[in-house]
């Protein structure tokens, strides 16, 4: 194991530049989700619900399962990065695989949730509130799915080439991306579901 004072994800100049670039990318992501949130919160008060009230449709147990899956995945991702910086490749791989599995649980339940709403006659086109709802959650879900694919690709690289100063910064960057999506979900859980379960229109 190297005794370099820097952790493995800090030993590549290119990797450090990529981290800086990713922070710039995240500001654009904040703007995107900020716009989607502002639209939904505006339509939450006075938007067209087409007679389909959130107080009747939202199911707390389902939302809690999704929330716990994503929040726990953030914790497991953090553990994976801890072991990455200790250069313990196998433990990093194990915890990242757990992160991916929890992410898949989240996406699976979100697909089930959307299918349930469609079965109840709710879709993207029936009212302005529901349009903003599906766009916000669909955008977040697509980002989570992208994150899962991204992590899997990096894990394949590590499995083939070993953990090194080139792929370690990428793992750190994807962990930032994953934590960002967890933060976005906390806002969704609070602003969309918690408010939606007690108020419609």
From Swiss-Prot:
Which SUPFAM superfamilies does the record match to this protein? Cytochrome c oxidase subunit III-like
Q: Which InterPro entries match?
A: Cyt_c/ubiquinol_Oxase_su3, Cyt_c_oxidase-like_su3, Cyt_c_oxidase_su3-like_sf, Cyt_c_oxidase_su3_a-hlx, QoxC, Ubiquinol_oxase_su3_dom
Q: Which GO terms describe its molecular function?
A: cytochrome-c oxidase activity
The protein's topology relative to the membrane is:
Multi-pass membrane protein
User: Can you supply a Gene Ontology BP term from the record?
Assistant: aerobic electron transport chain
Q: Where in the cell is it found?
A: Cell membrane
From which residue to which does the signal peptide run?
none
Enzyme class, spelled out: oxidoreductase
E.C. no? 1.10.3.-
Instruction: Note the superkingdom of the native organism.
Output: Bacteria
Predominant location category: membrane
Q: Which Gene3D superfamilies match?
A: Cytochrome c oxidase, subunit III, four-helix bundle
Q: What does this protein do?
A: Catalyzes quinol oxidation with the concomitant reduction of oxygen to water.
Name the family the entry cites. Answer: Belongs to the cytochrome c oxidase subunit 3 family.
Q: Please report the name of this protein according to its UniProt entry.
A: Probable quinol oxidase subunit 3
- What is the organism field in this record? Staphylococcus saprophyticus subsp. saprophyticus (strain ATCC 15305 / DSM 20229 / NCIMB 8711 / NCTC 7292 / S-41)
Q: Which gene encodes it?
A: qoxC
């Amino acid at each position: 194991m190297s005794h370099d004072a820097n952790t493995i994800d800090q030993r590549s100049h290119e990797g450090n530049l990529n981290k800086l670039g990713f922070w710039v990318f995240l500001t654009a992501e904040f703007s995107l989700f900020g716009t989607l949130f502002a639209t939904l919160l505006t339509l939450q008060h006075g938007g067209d619900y087409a007679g389909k009230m959130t107080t009747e449709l939202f199911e707390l147990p389902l939302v809690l399962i999704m929330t716990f899956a994503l929040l726990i995945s953030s914790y497991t991702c953090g553990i994976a990065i801890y072991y990455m910086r200790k250069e313990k490749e196998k433990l990093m791989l194990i915890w990242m695989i757990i992160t991916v599995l929890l992410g898949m649980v989240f996406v699976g339940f979100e697909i089930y949730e959307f299918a349930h709403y469609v079965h109840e006659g709710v879709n993207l086109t029936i009212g302005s509130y529901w349009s903003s709802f599906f766009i916000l959650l669909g955008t977040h879900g697509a980002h989570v799915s992208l994150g899962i694919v991204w992590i899997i690709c990096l894990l394949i690289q590590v499995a083939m080439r070993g953990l090194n100063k080139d792929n370690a910064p990428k793992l750190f960057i994807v962990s930032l991306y994953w934590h960002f999506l967890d933060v976005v979900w906390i806002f969704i859980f609070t602003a969309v579901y918690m408010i939606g379960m007690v108020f419609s229109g």
